[in-house]
């Protein structure tokens, strides 16, 4: 096991998996997780293709690759600057709350 936050897309359709992946990336940026795992399965590769096409277009993604030990899983690395921007926004909001 890789102990990364994991999204399992087994049983999902291509169009719904796009929404789930985007939400999963957003959630993990908020949580400051640099690496995540998206499980698409091996099968015919439809979900894998959908996920990889989505990741290829997402400017927040540094890189992605098939997990060496589990070819049904893609490891995704989020660019550090997106994690830091979110952290700075969070800290700024925390200061506003503290001032009240």
Describe the residue ranges of each PLM region:
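Long, charged, low-complexity intrinsically disordered regions
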Residues: 1-100
């Amino acid at each position: 096991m890789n102990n990364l936050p994991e999204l399992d897309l087994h049983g999902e359709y291509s169009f719904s998996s796009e929404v789930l992946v985007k939400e999963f990336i957003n959630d993990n940026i908020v949580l400051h997780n640099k690496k995540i795992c998206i499980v698409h399965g091996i099968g015919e590769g439809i979900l894998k293709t959908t996920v990889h096409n989505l990741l290829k277009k997402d400017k927040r993604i540094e890189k992605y690759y098939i997990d060496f030990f589990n070819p049904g899983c893609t490891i995704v690395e989020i660019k550090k600057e997106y994690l830091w921007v979110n952290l700075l926004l969070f800290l700024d909001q925390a200061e506003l709350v503290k001032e009240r």
